[in-house]
UniProtKB/Swiss-Prot annotation:
Keyword Transmembrane helix (UniProt): yes
GO molecular function: 4-hydroxybutyrate receptor activity; riboflavin transmembrane transporter activity
Task performed by this protein: Plasma membrane transporter mediating the uptake by cells of the water soluble vitamin B2/riboflavin that plays a key role in biochemical oxidation-reduction reactions of the carbohydrate, lipid, and amino acid metabolism. May also act as a receptor for 4-hydroxybutyrate.
Domain of life, per lineage: Eukaryota
Family to which this protein belongs: Belongs to the riboflavin transporter family.
Any Gene Ontology CC annotation: plasma membrane
Topology within the bilayer: Multi-pass membrane protein
Expression sites by tissue: Highly expressed in the placenta and small intestine, moderately in the kidney, colon, lung, prostate, uterus, and thymus, and weakly in all other tissues.
Protein name in the entry: Solute carrier family 52, riboflavin transporter, member 2
Region: Disordered, residue numbers: 230-268
Gene name of this polypeptide: Slc52a2
Protein localization: Cell membrane
Catalytic activity: riboflavin(in) = riboflavin(out)
Glycosylation sites: 178
């Protein structure tokens, strides 16, 4: 059969990437904007712990999607996807003018509008993992990697936008100790205004979410209507060591077909796809849950404690470069995909090595090793980049291996992602918000001197 035009193939990959970009860009945008809004909102630096809880509660979106599937079995997958996209667009659109609104709750001021809308966005983002991923079962594995590339952009673009905004600009004013004489000392930190406001930041996020929704509509025009749920495979098939070469050939062949024909080829039930709870499948899903528990729950909760002792610059470099490692890992997976379970677990141990180093720095905050040195800055930033890159590659490789099981496998992958993220967030809430396990420093104050 004749190969499709290259332009059509590239367009489909682009639309899938833009579609994936809208999955978590709202919550990621709120996270990177915290250094700006926290200066205005009454919760202060406890705001990240509030947001962690709200994102964990956002897993209720999983229950809402499950309820919808029970009440409307066999219905088109586009409806929950469009609802999720609509909630994200409306939520960020309302954040732009309302984020700074406060109200009295139990006699104390709270940022009710910001927290409420953050919860709505958390619901939509968490639901995206069990609505967006099953839709991709109608496409071959290379398009799934384009989707994860888009998810990487959902973390990278807000960080780039935040740097353009000027997040983290801080200077310490030196003044004489006694009038006009005496040695200079550091006093209150000076925060310079950003290049544009938080409201403008949220408007840009709204535009990006609108672009993602438009990309999904474009995919619906390119692809035929997906088959009803009853005709989908009911099991999870993962390749065995003896069929790796055949699997690679089967995976490569759909790229030579138009997206419409690919959908009908990939979505047909596989008579061998019946081992949903095989040991290999369980290992892959467990690995997916562990990596997401670390990257979405455990490590983000301590990122400020591990980085801020080395300065605002180290913190923002770790955020931006660590986020950029995500799409780079997706590019690597598109070229070289690890199909060995032992290899993936080996990579997981490598990622845990970097994660352990970062957790150690957070526990020793505000006086970790090499504080105040360039070597300390390089090590903490490099550790965040490598940790994020390794775990991102594991996520893409694991999901690609699960793809052969069709929609049920990708649905199970989405559940594993959210369950892991939920457990990680719950585990880190007491030590970061209740018990003084991690201690923060003060700007322009040397707490590590003799």
């Amino acid at each position: 059969m004749a190969a499709p035009p290259l332009g059509r193939l590239v367009l489909t990959h682009l639309l899938v990437a833009l579609f994936g970009m809208g999955s978590w860009i709202a919550v990621n945008g709120i996270w990177v904007e915290l250094p700006v809004v926290v200066k205005e909102l009454p919760e202060g630096w406890s705001l990240p712990s509030y947001l962690s809880v709200l994102v964990a509660l956002g897993n209720l979106g999983l229950l809402l999607v499950t309820l919808w599937r029970r009440l409307a079995p066999g219905k088109s997958e586009r409806i929950p996807i469009q609802v999720v996209q609509g909630l994200s667009i409306v939520g960020t659109g309302l954040l732009a003018p309302l984020w700074s609104n406060m109200a009295l709750v139990a006699g104390q001021l709270h940022s009710v509008a910001f927290l409420t809308l953050a919860f709505v966005l958390a619901l939509s983002c968490c639901a995206s993992n069990v609505t967006f991923l099953p839709f991709l079962s109608h496409l071959p594995p290379p398009f799934l990697r384009s989707f994860f590339l888009g998810q990487g952009l959902s973390a990278l673009l807000p960080c780039v936008l935040a740097l353009a905004q000027g997040v983290g600009r801080l200077e310490c004013l030196h003044v004489p100790a006694n009038g006009t004489t005496g040695p200079p000392i550091k006093v209150s930190p000076i925060n310079f205004p950003e290049r544009f406001s938080a409201g403008t930041f949220f408007w840009v996020l709204t535009a990006l979410l609108g672009t993602s929704a438009a990309a999904f509509q474009g995919l619906l025009l390119l692809l035929p209507s997906p088959p009803p749920e009853a005709t989908m495979g009911t099991g999870l098939r993962v390749e065995t060591p003896g069929t790796e070469e055949e699997e690679e050939e089967e995976e490569a062949s759909p790229l030579q077909e138009p997206p419409g024909q690919v959908a009908s080829i990939v979505s047909s039930p596989d008579p061998k796809a019946h081992r949903l709870f095989s040991s290999r499948s369980a290992c892959l899903l467990g690995l997916l849950a562990i990596t997401n528990a670390l990257t979405n729950g455990v490590l983000p909760a301590v990122q400020s404690f591990s980085c801020l002792p080395y300065g605002r610059l180290a913190y923002h470099l770790a955020v931006v470069l660590g986020s950029s490692a995500n799409p780079l890992a997706c590019f690597l997976a598109m070229a070289v995909l690890c199909r060995s379970l032992a290899g993936l677990y080996g990579l997981c141990l490598l990622g845990m090595f970097f994660g352990t180093y970062l957790m150690t720095l957070a526990v020793l905050s505000p006086c970790p090793p090499l504080v105040g040195t360039s070597a300390g800055v390089v090590l903490v930033v490099l550790s965040w980049v490598l940790c994020a890159g390794v775990f991102s590659y594991i996520k893409v490789a694991t999901s690609s291996m699960l793809h052969s099981g069709g929609r049920p496998a990708l649905l199970a992958a989405g559940v594993a992602i959210q369950v892991g993220s939920l457990l990680g967030a719950i585990a880190m809430f007491p030590p970061t918000s209740v018990y003084p396990v991690f201690r923060s420093g003060e700007d322009c104050v040397d707490q590590c001197g003799p």
